Regions:
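Conserved GHKL (Bergerat-fold) ATPase module
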Residues: 1-291
Length: 291
C-alpha cells in the first residue's frame, strides 16, 4: 500500500471521483434553477410548486447521494487537507433560509448573503428543534441573516477544519466575539453606553458567580432573552462538550480540562436585567437580590 505507484493511483482516483461529484452537484443546481424559472413563467406550475418541493428534492440525484454518503464527505474534509477546498463545495446543510427544510450548498449561502455581511454563521445542536428555537438566533433573525444548522455529531468537527469559504469566515453564533458587519458609529456608541451603564451589575454578578463563570459582559446577540452563556472563541461549544462527554471511551479528566468556563452575556434592554441593575445598586447584599 505504500508503493509509490499505488499512492499516485489513489490520488488520481480521488481527483476523478471529486470531479464526477462536482459535475453531478452543479447539474443538480442548474436543473433546480431552470425549474424555478419555468415555474415563474407558468402560473399553474407556480401554484403547485410548494406541494411538489419535497418530491423534487428527492429526485435530485446529488441530494440522494448526499443523504447516503454525506458523512464520508465530511470525514474527507477532516482528513484530506489537500482536497479540502474541493470537498467544501460538495457540502450540503439545512439553514434558517427556509426553516431548515431544504439542503443548501455553501456557494448558495454566500450568494444569498447581505451586502454588508462578512461571515457565514452557523449554530450546532443535538437536533433541528433545538437549533431552531435557540436564543442565540434572536438578533440574527431580526437582521434577516441566514444561519446554517449543524445537527449531525460530525458537523462541528468538519466545520472546525474549514475556517473560511470563498473569503468568508465561518463563525459560530454560540461563541463570544460575534459581529454582524453592519455596525455603525451609533451602534458602537450605544454598545459602549450600555457597557458603562451595566458596569455596576456585571461587577456585582461576577462577585456572586465567582469562579463559576469566566466573565459577565453585555450582549449584542439577544433581543428578548435576559441572558445567555457563551463559550470562548477558541473553546469547545456546548454541543461539542455534550458530544465528547457522551462518547463511550471519553477521558473525563481530559474532557474537563478542555471544557472552558463560560461567559455570561446579559441583555441590557430586558426588564429583568434593568430591575436587577437597580436592586444590585440599592441592596447588593440582599439574599432576595442574589436569588
Amino acid at each position: 500500500q505504500q508503493h509509490k505507484v499505488l499512492r499516485v493511483m489513489g490520488k488520481k482516483l480521488t481527483r476523478k471521483a471529486l470531479e464526477m461529484l462536482r459535475k453531478l452537484s452543479q447539474k443538480a443546481a442548474k436543473d433546480a434553477e431552470d425549474a424555478a424559472e419555468a415555474a415563474g413563467d407558468d402560473e399553474e406550475a407556480a401554484a403547485t410548486e410548494g406541494d411538489d418541493k419535497d418530491a423534487e428534492e428527492k429526485k435530485d440525484p446529488y441530494i440522494e447521494f448526499w443523504e447516503a454518503f454525506g458523512k464520508n464527505i465530511k470525514l474527507g474534509l477532516i482528513e484530506d487537507s489537500s482536497n479540502r477546498t474541493k470537498l467544501s463545495k460538495l457540502l450540503r446543510f439545512k439553514t434558517s433560509a427556509d426553516g431548515g427544510d431544504k439542503w443548501s450548498s455553501l456557494e448558495q449561502y454566500v450568494g444569498r448573503m447581505k451586502e454588508w455581511q462578512k461571515s457565514i454563521y452557523y449554530i450546532s445542536g443535538k437536533d433541528m428543534e433545538e437549533v431552531k428555537s435557540s436564543a442565540f438566533l434572536e438578533r440574527l433573525m431580526a437582521k434577516g441573516l441566514e444561519v446554517i444548522f449543524l445537527t449531525d455529531p460530525i458537523d462541528e468537527y468538519a466545520i472546525q477544519n474549514l475556517t473560511e469559504f470563498d473569503g468568508k469566515k465561518l463563525q459560530s453564533v454560540t461563541k463570544e466575539g460575534l459581529k454582524f458587519g453592519d455596525e455603525e458609529d451609533v451602534d458602537t456608541k450605544r454598545a459602549e453606553l450600555y457597557k458603562e451603564q451595566m458596569k455596576p451589575l456585571t461587577k456585582w454578578m461576577k462577585g456572586v458567580y465567582g469562579e463559576n463563570v469566566e466573565k459577565i459582559s453585555v450582549s449584542v446577540r439577544l433581543a428578548s432573552t435576559p441572558c445567555i452563556f457563551v463559550t470562548s472563541q477558541y473553546g469547545y461549544s456546548a454541543n461539542m462538550e455534550r458530544i465528547m462527554q457522551s462518547q463511550a471511551f471519553a477521558d473525563n479528566k481530559r474532557t474537563q480540562y478542555l471544557v472552558s468556563k463560560k461567559t455570561m452575556e446579559i441583555n441590557p434592554r430586558h426588564p429583568i436585567v434593568v430591575e436587577l441593575l437597580k436592586r444590585s445598586e440599592e441592596a447588593p447584599d440582599s439574599e432576595e437580590t442574589k436569588d
